[in-house]
Amino acid sequence: MAPHVEQLEFQAEARQLLDLMIHSVYSNKDSFLRELISNASDALDKLRLEAFRNKDLDVDTSDLHIEIVVDKEARTLTVRDNGIGMSRDEVVRLIGTLAKSGTAELRQQLREAKDANANEELIGQFGIGFYASFMVADRVELLTRKAGESEATRWESTGEGSYTIETVDQAGGEVPQGTSVTLHLKPEDREDELHDYTSEWKIRELVKQYSDFIAWPVRMDVERRTPASEEGGEETVTVETQTLNSMKALWARPRDEVSDEEYTEFYKHVAHAWDEPLETIAMRAEGTFEYQALLFIPSHAPFDLFQQNATVGVQLYVKRVFIMGDCDQLMPPYLRFVKGVVDAQDMSLNVSREILQQDRQIRAIRRRLTKKVLSTIAEMQAERPEKYRTFWTQFGRVLKEGLLSDTDNQETLLRVSSFASTRSDDEPTTLAEYVERMPEGQTQIFYAAGESRQQLLNSPHLEAFKAKGYEVLLLTDPVDEVWVESIHEFDGKPLQSVAKGEVDLDSEADKEAQETERQQREKEFADVIAWLTEVLGDHVKEVRLSTRLTDSPACLITDTFGITPALARMYRASGQPVPVEKRILELNPTHPLVVGLREAHESRGADDELAGTAELLYGTALLAEGGALEDPARFAGLLADRLTRMVGEQS
């Protein structure tokens, strides 16, 4: 029978799509191989289903597979499967028409049929992946024969608006069942990201990256050369067929069927890591949104965890096909240390299959994954404290970012967080443990925020709390300065900074007993306080007696609702305008320096020397909390003058 050859035009939409595909849709030209393997996998799934449903279909399904064939001399690459194949009409309808892969229709049939044993893994719903071949090929040939039919069909196009299609008589049996796609490759061009797709190692790399977990074996014949055994002899060349993909989708297997060693090896593969995972999280969701996830919490923080371009470490698969690495839509930024994969069964994607739509499903999956990771951290905290301590040391700082960004899980994040405190040099505490230890009469959770533990321990702000035996949380991460401004309580207990507002640590009985003494001191210091308020008016908004100092002469505090200097510096560093706020200078009425300053002011009134002493008092308070002097040279001059006179008096 003479071949029935036609030359047809692509539909207008298909022509536009071809141009879009070649020039802009795919961000990576390597994606073409993923698309061809996905289509081949789809064809194998369809054949398996058809053989299951149609007992009259006489086909062999014992060795379903995908084959990659390269010809270096001809510069061709062929992807071949022995799946369902296509008829001539289907080729015209599916290849010459925009986005009609047939898989979406088949999935609808599956929903209706509910064939429990068919277990299809169909991935071709995107319908346009075949056209990606034209990114790397000048000409594409497709040869296909549908299972159960004798005629085959050959399709060919250069991607320039038209294609030829012909019927191939199967009388000679030269066309096997299934589909083969042959790409006549464009010249290699590294600048245009056109690689050598006839290279065995490049093909291995792409299959490993994109299609490692496809359910069907992806095979390729490879040459192996053995050096000559004797001098002057010839090397031996053998050809062996190798399977390039692992086909091990661990997330699809029940957890009790997977060993810890297998999980560890998979973690190292997917995370490009050298350590072992601290925790493994396997989950499956069924119902409205079906997906499987295999996530890992690493043992060590990556070096780039806090870099500006740090990315989420979760990969997205759809029907075991790699879609996207570092999928930030599946995990919030504060969980960017989590590694693993999510395999969705029916996720809506946009045209490139590389950029997810912000749809209801992806948001639902993200919420569930987030809650699962946080619940795992909570389990570690309660049941595996050693692992939790390792986790917190490595990732606690980044986890606390969620206190600012994730209001839905804020309570959980507070409970799984740990903080250093004055109770122990080594053991951090949770907020729940802190509250449990609060003595009778304490109604607030006290904290100090600063740059280092040592700086905070030496801070004048802690003196009264140490004297009373109250535990104080020591917050030293930059994010701490921010979240404490937005979270005001835990378990009904207010969070109170030791450096903000007024501190009242005495019981009612103590306050009554000390009231007369307090009033007397207020009178004694009224004049010097008024004078200091005037002299230091450029630096402070108020001067008052302190109830938080026991050893230091003075300290600076912020209004209850004011912005701390550290937080103001952070805002300014990020480009946000922050007005300069004057703070409050508190004096220790029992300190010799403050008492001497009061007596000197009473005896000789205000003078320049006393004003210099006032500036030194303010400067020492600023330095004691780790602050920076506004005019270090003036402070040094005043200090040198006082030291000179002191040495002179002693000599």
UniProtKB/Swiss-Prot annotation:
Pfam families: HATPase_c_3, HSP90. Residues 570-651 are annotated as: C. It is found in: Cytoplasm. One of its GO terms (molecular function) is unfolded protein binding. GO terms for cellular component: cytoplasm. Residues 354-569 are annotated as: B. CDD domains: HATPase_Hsp90-like. Gene3D superfamilies: 3.30.230.80, 3.40.50.11260, Heat shock protein 90, C-terminal domain (1.20.120.790), Histidine kinase-like ATPase, C-terminal domain (3.30.565.10). The keyword Chaperone applies. Its main location: cytoplasm. InterPro entries: HATPase_C_sf (IPR036890), HSP90_C (IPR037196), Hsp90_fam (IPR001404), Hsp90_N (IPR020575), Ribosomal_Su5_D2-typ_SF (IPR020568). Keywords: ATP-binding, Chaperone, Cytoplasm, Nucleotide-binding, Stress response. Residues 1-353 are annotated as: A. The keyword ATP-binding applies. It comes from the Bacteria. Belongs to the heat shock protein 90 family. Homodimer. Molecular chaperone. Has ATPase activity. This is Chaperone protein HtpG. It comes from Mycolicibacterium gilvum (strain PYR-GCK) (Mycobacterium gilvum (strain PYR-GCK)).
